[in-house]
Each structure stands twice: as C-alpha cells, then as structure tokens.
Amino acid sequence: MWLFLGIAGLLTAVLSGLPSPAPSGQHKNGTIPNMTLDLEERLGIRLVNGSSRCSGSVKVLLESWEPVCAAHWNRAATEAVCKALNCGDSGKVTYLMPPTSELPPGATSGNTSSAGNTTWARAPTERCRGANWQFCKVQDQECSSDRRLVWVTCAENQAVRLVDGSSRCAGRVEMLEHGEWGTVCDDTWDLQDAHVVCKQLKCGWAVKALAGLHFTPGQGPIHRDQVNCSGTEAYLWDCPGRPGDQYCGHKEDAGVVCSEHQSWRLTGGIDSCEGQVEVYFRGVWSTVCDSEWYPSEAKVLCRSLGCGSAVARPRGLPHSLDGRMYYSCKGQEPALSTCSWRFNNSNLCSQSRAARVVCSGSQRHLNLSTSEVPSRVPVTIESSVPVSVKDKDSQGLTLLILCIVLGILLLVSTIFIVILLLRAKGQYALPASVNHQQLSTANQAGINNYHPVPITIAKEAPMLFIQPRVPADSDSSSDSDYEHYDFSSQPPVALTTFYNSQRHRVTEEEAQQNRFQMPPLEEGLEELHVSHIPAADPRPCVADVPSRGSQYHVRNNSDSSTSSEEGYCNDPSSKPPPWNSQAFYSEKSPLTEQPPNLELAGSPAVFSGPSADDSSSTSSGEWYQNFQPPPQHPPAEQFECPGPPGPQTDSIDDDEEDYDDIGAA
C-alpha cells in the first residue's frame, strides 16, 4: 500500500510540474514588448539588426525611421541612447562600426564624388550636452564627411544562439546576459517558446521543442526557467519567466530544431553509411537531386555523417519523396547546408534521380581495407539532431506507460484486499447453530413445579416430556389393543389428557365453592355444541388419567378425549350410580412404578385403586381410567353431558397441600 501511495505521489508530481510561471507582464527590464515599442516611438530612436534590442544600428524617427550618420556622433550620445532604452549605462558601451557591406543602398565606401547627390541619415544631434536623451538635439544634416553608420552595443546587451547542433538553426538554447552565456531550463518549454528563438535567429519556424539531454549539457549559469512565450515576441528575453539558477540543472537544458535546419540520412543500404541520400528540411524528408551530385558533394556528406570518405556514387532510383534538394559544393565545407543549395527547383532537378553514395565506413568495405576506416563508428544515420532527438510524444508515451503500470498495481492491490476481507469474514462470522430439541427448565429432575400455569397454552409452547420407567411384564395390564412402547432414549410422546387438565385448571376458591364448570376441550368442541342433553348412558364416565397407585386425585368430568383426537363421553344416568364402598385395589400403573398425584380443581380425592376391568388404553398407548364417582349427589346440571361438568371434591386430609405430580422420573 505504501508503495502504491509513493508511486501515485511521484506521478502527481511529474504531471503537475513546478509552480506556474511568473505573471505575463513580468520580464527583465520591467516592460513588455508593446511597452518597449511605445518607448522607442516616444523617444524616436531604436537599435535594429542586432542580436537584441540593446545592440544594433541606430535609427531615428523623423518622417520615417532613418539610420544615423556617424559624422556628428559622440560618446555622450551613445550613453544617452543606452540609458533611454534601459540597456545599461555608459560604463560598458562600445562603438562598433559596421563594414561597408552593411551601408544603406546607394552608399559606397570611398566614393566621394557622389556625396552631393546622396541624402544620408540625419544626425540625432550634433552634440549631446549630457547623458540624458532630452539634452540631445536632432539635426537634419547630410553626412558629407563621414558616410559610415553608427553601431552601438550597450552594456546590457542580450543575445541568443543554438549550439552543439549540426547547424546554426538547431541545438541547445543559450542566452547572453550580463556578458556571460547561459542556458534555458526546459520547464514549460514548448513550440511557442522555440518559435521565438527560431524567428530571432532567422531560421524559419520551430519544428521541434526539445527537452533536456537531447544535446550535450551546457555549462555556466542558467538564465531562464519556466519561459512562457506567446509566440509573437521579438526576443526570447521579452517572454515572461523566472531566474533558472534555483530549481534547474544542466540536464534540463532546452533545445530547438528550426525549419531551416538541415539533417541527412542514408537509406536502403546495408548500414547507415550506404544508401539513398535524404535531407530533413522544413519539417519533411526530401531526396537529393543527382543532376549535380559529384565527388565533392559526396565527400562533404560522408565526412559530416562520420562515415569517412566517399568511395562510390551508384546510380539512384527515381524520386520517391515529395521534396527535392539541389547542392553545389567545393569539397571543403563542413556540411551540405553551408554549400550553395536550392529547394524544389524544377529547373535544376527536372531530369534527375535520387542521389546515392557509398562511404568508406560502410560494412561493405571494412573487410577490404583498414586504411580508410573512419576514426569513429557512426551512431546515427543522419545528423545528430533529428535522429537522436525525441519530442514530447515520447514523454507522453512514458507517462502513459507509467499510468498503465500504476493502474495494474491498483487493481492487484484491490483484489488482494478483497481476498483478505473474505477470508476474515469466513473466519469470524460462523453460522449460529440453534438446538430446537433441548428445552431449558429451571427445575431439577424429580421436583414438582408449582408455578402458575396459564389458562391457554400457546401452540408454539414447548412440550413437556415425561420419561416413564420401564414397567415389569407382570405389572402391566391392558386390553387386546395395547401397543407396547419402545422405552428408548428418545423422549416419549406427550400425554394429551395431561395438557388438557393443565389448560383447564381451576383455582382453589372455585374448588371450595364446588361450583365451577370445566370449559370444553378443544378436541371435543364439535360435540360440546349440542343443544340437547343426551340420553342416559349406563356406561361409567371415562377418565384419561392412568392408575398410579392407591391414592390419586380424580378429575370428575364426564367429557374426555383420546390422544387420537376422538372425543368420547361417559354419560351417567339421571341419578348418579351408587358408590362402591369397596376401595380400589392397588395396582401399579403399566407406565410408571410410582403413581402420580393429579390435582383436580384444587381438591384432593383419595381412592384405593381402580378395578382391573376399569382400566384400558387407547391405540396410541395412552392410558385412561374408568372409575365410579363417590356417593355424592351433585346438582343434576353438573352431570349434563356433553355440557361442562361440575367437580366433585372429597376432603380426606385438611392439612394435605394441593399438589400436582407431573411424574418426574
């Protein structure tokens, strides 16, 4: 992650660059080009044809710009001009008289016979009484005695040049300031800046604006950084920028290739020292006409390419490129660009072919003789500038590759983080296991639960399971439809009649009043809604409580149901049956050895035990007991069946507490 952040920061720094250049109105002398022109027009004087605005031939503005005659020029006038143009003081002023070839048209050196017939430039003053321009007076006077022009170079002279290229129109940009040559930093360097340099050097327009290390690194100070030209400036120092001696080094020296620069290459051969001659000029590649392609021209080309001397000039092919160049050399020139040349001259190249040459540095001739092997092996197939030059497209390609690599790293990091998160989620987020089989209870095994039981038990309420003990074979008594239980470790099926008794449990107060009616069971609701009283049935009422011993509580209702949800009713006669005083004989229940005490309406009733023929079981294995009620005459409406029955209570022991044995094992 830290590596990714570091690469992102580096890419941001490369793309953003250094701070923005200086404001557009800032330059060395505190004026912009328009202000400089206004100053020259206001003063009526300027320096032209020099390397900068502080060097050149002096011209004054009368009706038009006229050159100044040197007949009445003195040192005070030179100092006044330099100060007026903000080019320094007189301490660094020199007088440079141009040669006669630079005189205006019609002027001839040493020809005095035509002096009276020629009107020369007006002198700006006969004599300046001080170093300020306002003390100088312009006189309209002919230059009869001295026909030379005034050439002034002020102390603050500035110049520009291109070095280490194959011609004066290509190379590393250098500026002259304060009498010392220095370089220009390539920060924010573009074609607009390069165009100003090419125009200033009269090299056409800029073809390429090059960053550092395309040419040999320079030496000395760095005069400019973050140059921001608009392309209309006359001089490079008129462009806004900053001093370059703080954040820039010589590995970032700016370079320029102008349209008038010429570079050459040999194509179609076995190496770079053999093939068809092509020239790069004004931004395009052109062929060279062989109409005047002689040994002198071939010799200059092979020498400038570092391929030794010319050994052959094979006949070339027809021209395959649009442009055509014509050269005429003497053989001593350093490059073809210094020879006489013409570009796209149809008369000179009308019946020509593309020129070809074989130099001594070619591999074809290295095995034949070593005397003609060049002193250095060529690296490029043309001049050093176009071949070794890389423009800003390569820089953009580098940034694109860096962005792609950064994107791949980001994608890999994202996938890795997602995998880690998924692994962490699978480790700590385990599914919760829920056991619906175990029921939590606060009671210990074998202890009765006396908490109040709600009247209505929700259907979702857990079932209370009773695990009976395995009865002996001799103690079990059942009808022919008895089905033996499989007393395994699995919990037994809950008794339906037991839950019915718990749901319809009555309070102790109602039991004492002996006036309560048991609400109808859910299992026999369809029978309880009968409006008439059924006929008397001699059969005894059937209870759903199994025999548990000699003493137990009886539920005195004639309405019950089996576990198979089949309702039945033992309807007594109009009179209660006679009570059998004979106590029930003791008989162990076939389900448990210890008989439970069932609480019915809070009133205990003790019986000796049921008879053997009164006990039976259903097909589902649930026991129920048929017993005869005690000899008590309850109200007749209490024994209506299938209506809600009335309870019967027998008080055996007043000190005995009401309890309900659930039959804990």
UniProtKB/Swiss-Prot annotation:
Disulfide bonds join 54-87, 69-143, 82-154, 128-136, 169-203, 185-248, 198-258, 229-239, 289-349, 302-359, 329-339. It comes from the Eukaryota. Residues 651-665 have a biased composition (Acidic residues). Glycans are attached at residues 29, 34, 49, 111, 117, 228, 344, 367. The chain crosses the membrane at residues 399-419. Residues 17-398 are extracellular. After T-cell activation, becomes hyperphosphorylated on Ser and Thr residues. Phosphorylated on tyrosine residues in response to stimulation of the TCR complex. Residues 45-155, 160-259, 264-360 form the SRCR domain. The modification Phosphotyrosine is found at residue 659. Residues 548-565, 580-595 have a biased composition (Polar residues). Residues 608-621 have a biased composition (Low complexity). Residues 536-665 are annotated as: Disordered. InterPro entries: SRCR, SRCR-like_dom_sf. Expressed predominantly in thymus, lymph node and spleen. One of its GO terms (molecular function) is lipoteichoic acid binding. GO terms for biological process: acute inflammatory response to antigenic stimulus; heterophilic cell-cell adhesion via plasma membrane cell adhesion molecules; immunological synapse formation; lipopolysaccharide-mediated signaling pathway; positive regulation of cytokine production involved in inflammatory response; positive regulation of T cell proliferation; response to lipopolysaccharide. Cell adhesion molecule that mediates cell-cell contacts and regulates T-cell responses via its interaction with ALCAM/CD166. Contributes to signaling cascades triggered by activation of the TCR/CD3 complex. Functions as a costimulatory molecule; promotes T-cell activation and proliferation. Contributes to the formation and maturation of the immunological synapse. Functions as a calcium-dependent pattern receptor that binds and aggregates both Gram-positive and Gram-negative bacteria. Interacts (via extracellular domain) with ALCAM/CD166 (via extracellular domain). Interacts with the TCR/CD3 complex subunit CD3E. Interacts (via tyrosine phosphorylated C-terminus) with LCP2 (via SH2 domain). Interacts (via glycosylated extracellular domain) with LGALS1 and LGALS3. Interaction with LGALS1 or LGALS3 inhibits interaction with ALCAM. Interacts with VAV1. This is T-cell differentiation antigen CD6. It comes from Mus musculus. The gene is Cd6.
